[in-house]
Amino acid sequence: WIMGHMVNAIAQIDEFVSLGANSIETDVSFDKNANPEYTYHGIPCDCGRTCTKWEYFNTFLGGLRKATTPGDSKYHEKLVLVVFDLKTGSLYDNQAYDAGTKLAKSLLQNYWNKGNNGGRAYIVLSIPNLDHYKLITGFKETLTKEEHPELMDKVGYDFSGNDDIGDVAKAYKKAGVTGHVWQSDGITNCLLRGLDRVRKAVANRDSSNGYINKVYYWTVDKRASTRDALDAGVDGIMTNYPDVIADVLSESAYTAKFRIATYDDNPWETFKN
């Protein structure tokens, strides 16, 4: 999965997909009542990027729905996965459940079109704080209450705080999550980070009793660091330059081992080294 980083304006969806992304990451900020409000990152952000592009969250979902609904004039067949980077740092811990509830309602209405030919992309809810695991509970219970539990088949999870892998496993246990787990590791492109924790995550994925289904690394903009991440066995790379990742994937060293994921590739299925 080539994951376009910080895609917060509708116009950027076309831009990143045309550069080779089959997945995008979108920031979601919340108001003080735990309503998802904007797709917005803010300053500071990655080096070389404009930090302040934004839409209202529900407006963005409408654009995203069009981009992922077959038959729509804005449809992109290859856009198959969306990571919502949920900026829950502005919320109190006890608001996490409400945030999950409100997020589910927004997606149901504006993305899934109440289950009637809505957007088809797989969704990853990426949460920065292990203490906010109840966001997952709120999300799940709301879709059940709204009589669309089947949509959970399209939803996966990520805790993005670079926490100890054992602590992440405990948070999933509390949330009752037993699959659909993506594990992120990384840092802003302005700084360097080694691959030690990525290797631990890959080892967990490849073990017989691990909780991780897929591992992705962020934010990778250079060919050398792309090769290092691929050599470590990641499933996804988040980048500001999808064309760089696509270029490296076309090198002879990688064409035999990797290919770009399509809609038929189940993102919750573990593919071991």
From Swiss-Prot:
Q: What class of enzyme is it?
A: lyase
Query: EC number(s)?
Result: 4.6.1.-
Q: Name one GO biological process term.
A: killing of cells of another organism
Task: For this UniProt record, give its keywords in alphabetical order, as a comma-separated list.
Answer: Cytolysis, Dermonecrotic toxin, Disulfide bond, Hemolysis, Lipid degradation, Lipid metabolism, Lyase, Magnesium, Metal-binding, Secreted, Toxin
Q: In which tissues is it expressed?
A: Expressed by the venom gland.
Q: Which family does it belong to?
A: Belongs to the arthropod phospholipase D family. Class II subfamily.
* Job description of the protein: Dermonecrotic toxins cleave the phosphodiester linkage between the phosphate and headgroup of certain phospholipids (sphingolipid and lysolipid substrates), forming an alcohol (often choline) and a cyclic phosphate. This toxin acts on sphingomyelin (SM). It may also act on ceramide phosphoethanolamine (CPE), lysophosphatidylcholine (LPC) and lysophosphatidylethanolamine (LPE), but not on lysophosphatidylserine (LPS), and lysophosphatidylglycerol (LPG). It acts by transphosphatidylation, releasing exclusively cyclic phosphate products as second products.
Would you tell me the protein name for this molecule?
A: Dermonecrotic toxin LsaSicTox-alphaIB1bi
